[in-house]
Amino acid sequence: MRTDYCGAINTRHLDKTITLCGWVHRRRDHGGVIFIDLRDREGIVQIVCDPDNVAAFQIAEKIRSEFVLAITGTVRHRPEGTVNHGILSGEIEVLVNAIEILNPSLTPPFQMDDDNLSEAIRLEYRYLDLRRPVMQRNIRLRHQVTMAVRIFLDQHGFIDVETPMLTKSTPEGARDYLVPSRVNAGHFFALPQSPQLFKQLLMVSGFDRYYQITRCFRDEDLRADRQPEFTQIDIETSFLPENEIMGMMEDMIRRLFASVLDISLPDPFPRLSYADAMFLYGSDKPDLRVPLVLTELTDLMQDVPFQVFRDAAQKAGGRVAALRVPGGGELSRKEIDEYTQFVGIYGAKGLAYIKINDLTKGIEGLQSPILKFLPESVVQSILERTQAQNGDLVFFGADKAKVVNDALGALRVKIGHERNLATDSWQPLWVVDFPMFEWDEEEKRWQALHHPFTSPSQGHEDFLTSDPGKALSRAYDMVLNGMEIGGGSIRIHRQDIQSKVFQALNISDDEAKLKFGFLLDALQYGAPPHGGIAFGLDRIVAMMTGADSIRDVIAFPKTQRAQCLLTQAPGAVEEKQLRELHIRLRRTENTNN
């Protein structure tokens, strides 16, 4: 039916008779000649319907937007002055010999070139939204990414192995999606949050290099850019230390960006410890495009009269830090108030500042409500440490370290981009040496910072029982432009160490055996040292395409309320289906009636 793609036609096809199939992007009637922009996945070509061809012209008069057509015609040069350099086929046009309407179309609810559509309309008519060139490009680039990954991993001896989609619920962290079993009444499968345990079992089984591009599921409260089902590039390997795994994986990402975007990423990627990342950037996923850093001031503030700073400096786990904003002296009171409101989102109770007007005048050359509470020697030390210059502004954070890091870390990125201080570049790095655990104030117990199968750093095994807060892990995260795109670790391959981690997490032996007994058993049968990583495919593709949301790089995504506007899922089911599954719904009464 078709000899060529619309977007692939160019001057090489001159004087050839071709057959094209596609959708009517636009139809124009100019002085009795009908022009049709015909679109397919490769692009657009201009079709010319001359009234001398009566049969074809009569059909062309009936054609409207989004009709799907088959057209046979002859390729010719466009007339002088009508060349369109904005499209690949812009030097030629196709003079119609014959047209067939393969299927008409209702009037679409939106134009395919409308860039101001509401997301609700786009998702409701996703099959039309996906026709838009930008969505075609996004989904095809996603395909290029997965193909590049598969080729790289195949070349490095990795085997694609599928793991179960129906598995056991082990609720740690996010909630599982549960699937009732009809044949095992009262029992439920869970959809996997990751293939973590199965890929470790594959290492025990001797498949020493595994990968899978797989769907994962988390029934969590959706944040701005999360999906209940998402895609991971899941990788595991045996007998390699973390340095070799990290080297191989950054090589894969470098090749990916080179082949898909023709972009050269640094070689090697910088590495930063978790402690240094928090100290300098207030974040374990720092955006290195922003050149600003935090400056430590806790030691300076131990005895200052300013109580807000002094209390934070003296309390265990407190921090006082500064953020210098080059040229920030021009910020208005209104802008400073807006930044103060912004850091409040992260728990900060205020945002003190000093404007540097003229360093040669000493204190008189500074402007701030807090100067009267700070000794001149302390102010001088602040200026020296921050390397403040005339015209700069220094913001301060003083609170628990987490609040200061979260608030100033987010403010650093916001100011960096809003004030055009960030570079237009790709800045990857590895963050390493994470703590094994973090303390949960609500539950009053330790929780795994990554997951409970992460190996402690060498020499830190004894901390698991004596002082879990001191234990570091063999975890590593790949960060790109302030986004975590991959997270991995060396896993625990000894049953005794795994049991100690469960104990540190307050998981009893009985609970561990019930949830993870199969893993604990497997570790006793010659489990090899192993480790791996999982990359977020949706996130990587969104960054590569410049999409505002991962929903723009997923063919059929859910909304922020975990709903599919196209199919109206999730939906109610018939009572008969519930009975077959041995499920009875408990309906809550409306107490307002």
From Swiss-Prot:
Keyword Protein biosynthesis carried by entry: yes
Region (Aspartate): 196-199
Organism superkingdom: Bacteria
EC number, as in UniProt: 6.1.1.23
Residues involved in L-aspartate binding: 172, 218, 450, 491
Stored Pfam families: GAD, tRNA-synt_2, tRNA_anti-codon
GO biological process: aspartyl-tRNA aminoacylation
Record PROSITE patterns: AA_TRNA_LIGASE_II
CDD domains: AspRS_core, EcAspRS_like_N
Enzyme class, broadest EC rank: ligase
Gene Ontology CC terms: cytoplasm
Protein's cellular compartments: Cytoplasm
Binding site for ATP: 218-220, 227, 484, 536-539
Coiled coil: none
Catalytic activity field: tRNA(Asx) + L-aspartate + ATP = L-aspartyl-tRNA(Asx) + AMP + diphosphate
GO molecular function per UniProt: aspartate-tRNA ligase activity; aspartate-tRNA(Asn) ligase activity; ATP binding; nucleic acid binding
Marked site positions, Important for tRNA non-discrimination: 30, 81
InterPro entries: Aa-tRNA-synt_II, aa-tRNA-synth_II, aa-tRNA-synth_II/BPL/LPL, Asp-tRNA-ligase_1, Asp-tRNA-ligase_1_N, Asp/Asn-tRNA-synth_IIb, AspRS_core, GAD-like_sf
Purpose of the protein: Aspartyl-tRNA synthetase with relaxed tRNA specificity since it is able to aspartylate not only its cognate tRNA(Asp) but also tRNA(Asn). Reaction proceeds in two steps: L-aspartate is first activated by ATP to form Asp-AMP and then transferred to the acceptor end of tRNA(Asp/Asn).
Quaternary structure, from the entry: Homodimer.
Sequence similarity: Belongs to the class-II aminoacyl-tRNA synthetase family. Type 1 subfamily.
Protein name, per record: Aspartate--tRNA(Asp/Asn) ligase
Organism whose genome encodes this protein: Nitrosomonas europaea (strain ATCC 19718 / CIP 103999 / KCTC 2705 / NBRC 14298)
Lineage of producing organism: Bacteria, Pseudomonadati, Pseudomonadota, Betaproteobacteria, Nitrosomonadales
